[in-house]
Regions:
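Non-catalytic connector elements of ABC transporters
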Residues: 1-80
Length: 80
């Protein structure tokens, strides 16, 4: 993936993942270190656990449009 140190983020185009699900955040359970994100997609709910820091940096909130990237070992979130 392409990492831009000026933005401290990866571009969506640079991420090579087969299973991508566009959806809307329906619930955020925020913890001190990790947060659980429920994303409503056309295929159903996808749940991801990401750092609370990432939730804040991406400015994620209920209703945010995101893409859930599903790999065999993880589910990642990118804000649209």
């Amino acid at each position: 993936a392409h990492f831009d140190p000026r933005r401290n983020t990866m571009t969506i185009k640079a991420i090579n993942v087969r299973n991508q699900f566009k959806g809307t955040i329906k619930e955020i359970v925020e913890g001190d270190v990790l947060s659980e994100i429920d994303v409503q997609t056309a295929s159903g709910i996808v749940t991801s656990v990401i750092t609370t820091r990432s939730v804040k940096e991406l400015e994620l909130s209920i209703g945010s449009e995101v893409i859930a990237f599903v790999k065999s070992t993880e589910v990642s979130i990118a804000k649209l």
